[in-house]
C-alpha cells in the first residue's frame, strides 16, 4: 500500500502509561442529520510510539499502518506541539 494513501489524523495524547503505546483522542466535527447542529465527536486510537517520546497533552500526527497488535493500527509520525 502506498504511504501517501494512508489516512492521517491530528490528535491529543490522553494516556502514555503503556510501553511503546499511547492513546490519542481525535476530535471531529459532525453535523446532526436531522437538526443540523454541529457536534464534536471524539474517537480514541491506540498508537505505536517506538521511542516512548509522546507525553500526555502533546499534539501529534498519526498515520494508518498494518495491524501491530489486537488494537493498534496507527503509528506516530511526529509530535506537532509539546505539552506545556
Swiss-Prot record:
It holds the Pfam family Ribosomal_S17. This is Small ribosomal subunit protein uS17. NCBIfam families: PRK05610.1, uS17_bact. One of its GO terms (cellular component) is cytosolic small ribosomal subunit. The lineage of its organism: Bacteria, Bacillati, Bacillota, Clostridia, Eubacteriales. One of the primary rRNA binding proteins, it binds specifically to the 5'-end of 16S ribosomal RNA. One of its GO terms (molecular function) is rRNA binding. Keywords: Ribonucleoprotein, Ribosomal protein, RNA-binding, rRNA-binding. The keyword Ribonucleoprotein applies. The keyword Cell division does not apply. It comes from Clostridium botulinum (strain Eklund 17B / Type B). Part of the 30S ribosomal subunit. GO terms for biological process: translation. Belongs to the universal ribosomal protein uS17 family.
